[in-house]
């Protein structure tokens, strides 16, 4: 915590001005009342972003802990310009499109047993919103069990979802760590019993969607790092400035929505972790102000919980979006049931009908749809009590700062919280190599195996080669084909083996010809010995050329290395 910082519950952040006795009087909201959250709604271009910018800039310059999640990018870049020199080292600038210096962010890192279902619920609701066309009950069921299992295994990331489905050795290793009996039963009894046909039908949709993120280096280099390079709880407790630039135009809408949703979940978990502190320690912790513009892009199942519980852990939310139908009914209920201050710019007819219950009888639906640029109606939390609705105008943008340390801020953040792209990609490649199929299996030496392929390791090949050399030197009379793959150093053994096979085949053919010439004598001989005729083994790869064995075919059969 900044030793010079002192929390002032009466500190006001200004955002509007109203007429009082023929004078234009600026007003704002006190720090203590901000803990009841602020909800901003209005059509695009009405001034919502400017309102949020003005509040965040004041927080930054007042030494507060701030997180601003911006889906457009313009506000995030503007905030960098207003960071004073004294706070340059306080900034964590998260711009995923800065592919040369990616931060590490693992949403699955260090999640306690009692928080795992919250993380999974948040991820599942995000996936469902992003993959609405491909979502199914079966996909949800399997993916949920994948995530719950991976959360129990140390060092896993979202990239491991596909590895869990296709790498049997990795899957078995993860299941060994699972302690949740329901999750373990799914993998041991249910998934293990799936037929190949069913598995091929059930899992490709998940692999395809997760694979889209895994194949994009912009996202992969962030979410595939096992350890996050920043600590959100530490940010909250030490009043850091966390600026998140999720410009959809530069990184894609789905990528921005996924990262924003995961960040929101982790911020909530970080705030919840304050519950583990003593009452005395919690009372001394500073507040943390979270701004989310176009919040419907990052909303997930945990958002309703954030609105209802965050105040207890000194997490204040200021959220903005364009119209009510962008969020589900349960989120709407959480907003109007928990938010203390509601600010509306001009809205459409549907939103006006919903909001009139808040503003009538002072303002009616037709008033809400006719507001001008920067004009607002609001009900404000004042000393813990909601005010009557009143009208105002938002303040103009904050004047340009007399300083501009934006470049230094970005450079300092890179040096502290990012890693060079080459280093990150090498680390991810090493992890992939370590966890590749067979990575968890000990090398086996199966002497009964007759077929060898190019995927077998060299040590097994050398063992078989040595075995065949010894067999050849000892004059083994067996007529079965050699199993080994001979190298250049084994040419002598190869010649002996070829000669032995040639003699063997010639001898057998000679015996067969002799038997044909004297069939009666041949049969009598067999009856006396009471042994069935010994069949001549003929391998599919062997050929006859005028009674001689093709040396080329034998070499091909023995897989000779030239």
Question: Residue ranges of each PLM-predicted region?
Answer:
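Conserved P-loop NTPase motor module
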Residues: 1, 16, 162, 173-178, ...
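Short beta-strand elements
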Residues: 28, 234, 394-396
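P-loop NTPase motor domains
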Residues: 5-24, 31-46, 51-312, 368, ...
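Short amphipathic C-terminal alpha-helix that caps PH/PH-like domains
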Residues: 259-267, 355, 359, 396, ...
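Residue-level detector of flexible, active-site-proximal loop/helix-junction positions
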Residues: 98-100, 324, 349, 399
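Conserved ATP-driven motor cores of ASCE-family P-loop NTPases powering translocation/secretion/packaging/pilus
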Residues: 83, 111-117, 306-389
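Extended hydrophobic-aromatic, low-complexity segments
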Residues: 253-256, 271-280, 300-303, 315, ...
